[in-house]
Amino acid sequence: ALVCTLSVFNGFQDMVASFFTAFDPQLKITVREGKVFDGQDKRIGVVCLLPEVDVFTETLEENAMVQYKDRQAMVVLKGVEDNFEELTAIDSILYGAGDFLLHDSIVNYGVMGGELVATLGTGLQFVDPLQVYLPKRNAKVNMANPGASFNRDYLYSPGVVFVVNQQEYDGKYILTSLDFLRQLLDYTTEVSAIELKLLSLIHISE
C-alpha cells in the first residue's frame, strides 16, 4: 500500500513549517511496508497527472559509507532527478561558489550538508573524489575479501553545500543523481518516494 504524506496543513502552517525545511516537499508518496516500490506504477502516474500537481520527482534514499582521504562517515544518500530544484527551495540553502549540479557527461556530483563537510574535512570545493560504498544487495559478506561484498563509486564536488540548521540533514545527507544511486543498488525503476509540489496549497475544510 502507498501512503501520501502532507507536509503543510492549512491552519497549522506556521507550526508545521518549523519542522520542515527547504529540503522537504509539500507532498510525499511512500510505501507502507518495505523500503522501495516501482516508480512506474500506474497508480503513481494517475496521481502525478492530476491538474493540481505542478512538479513531481522520483527520489531514492539509502544508507552508505563514504570516505574522504583518511576520514569516514555513515551517511544517507538521496538520489533525486534533475528537476529537484523546481520541487523545493533548495537554492535558498546552498552555500559556495558553484552550482546545484548532480551530474554531467563525465562524473556524478554530491551536494553535502554543512556538518558532514566539517566531519569529513572536504571543504566546500574538494578536489579528490569522495568514495561511496554500498553493500551489494542479496549478497553474503565474503570474509576472505570483504571489499568484494560492496559496490563502490565516486562523487565529486559541484562547489556548493546545503545548510538547513537541522542535524538530521546537515550531518548525514548527500544529494546526488537518482541514476547514480540506482546503479549502485542494482535498481531500475525502484524509488523510495515520489515527491510532489502543488500549484497551490490544498485548503482543508474544518
Spans of features found by a protein language model:
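Hydrophobic, regular-secondary-structure patches
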Residues: 7-76, 82-89, 93-106
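A generic local secondary-structure boundary/capping motif
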Residues: 17, 65-67, 98-100, 119-123, ...
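Soluble periplasmic/extracytoplasmic beta-strand elements of cell-envelope proteins
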Residues: 28-30, 57, 74-79, 110-113, ...
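A generic structural signal for short hydrophobic patches within well-formed alpha-helices
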Residues: 85, 116-117, 181
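Mechanotransmission and gating elements of multispan inner-membrane complexes involved in transport
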Residues: 135-140, 145-205
